[in-house]
Amino acid sequence: MWLFVGPQLLAGIGQVTKQYADLLEAEYCQVGQRPKRAGYDRGFAFVLPIKEQLDLFDQYRAFCPEWTYMTVCETEPVNDCYGLLERYPEIHVPSEFSRQILEKQFPKIKWSLLRHWSESKVPRGVTSVTPYVFYSIGNILDPRKNIKKLIEAYLRCEFRDAAHLVLKATCTQPVEWRVPGVTIINGLLSPAELEKVHATSHCYVNCSHSEGVGMGAVEAALRSKPVVITDYGGLKEYVKTPWVVPCTTGPIGFDDFLFKKEHNWGHPDSVVLQAHLEDCFQKKVVAWDHSHTRELMDEVTRWPGWRQCSS
């Protein structure tokens, strides 16, 4: 029996850890809370290189004789504090992008690949393309998500009433922006409510500076949506699409959480982003074949590590 430990579910890494737990029909425990049982066969924790957080996770070690640890990164290089993870001999990452960066900077750790997982869904057909709905899911206040540039590109398209942009915010505080043609959905949604967001939208857009993975786009692909992505980070390993926005690699330019201003990430081409939005809108693309994404999800279900104990 597995125990999965992670942060609150509004956090992206909380969601992906919970999805692993759902895959194995196992318990998900939010860090800081007590597990339901006294002991488990194996534990899984998604960790970031923050000493206080790592000390919290260490309090769970007694519940499981064996642990699997995972982390992620979005810049090159990464913060030196990732060296704190050397307390773990092996750490899994969800993309080759992350593995190559971390392996180069911290060779003492064994970095192994374990893809993120989400359940494949039977796509629900959208009955109308008027208005044509673009959408994106994530922490829209996070500068890495580059949402203001997405809004600017969308407004330059001048779709007027023929299109709409829906932003599902996964922020800890409500976002009250007032932008014509843009709807912001705040708060943690139930699975059924989130499914409705997918079902009533047409085209998913990710224009992040970088993604360790970018599960919103992956989940849209698993619902056969057309997806616009950027080419810096791990997302392009998960989603194959003709609507890829090229990035120029360069410094972030400011300090933010684990990011330093001298670290590099991608700067998406706003002209190409706008062109991709216009192309999907003009062609009214509402479905796309994402066989590659589905195959990756199937591979995750067969990961040998899951079989090291019963679920």
Model-derived segments and spans:
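Acidic anion/phosphate-binding donor-loop and adjacent secondary structure
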Residues: 79-80, 113, 117-132
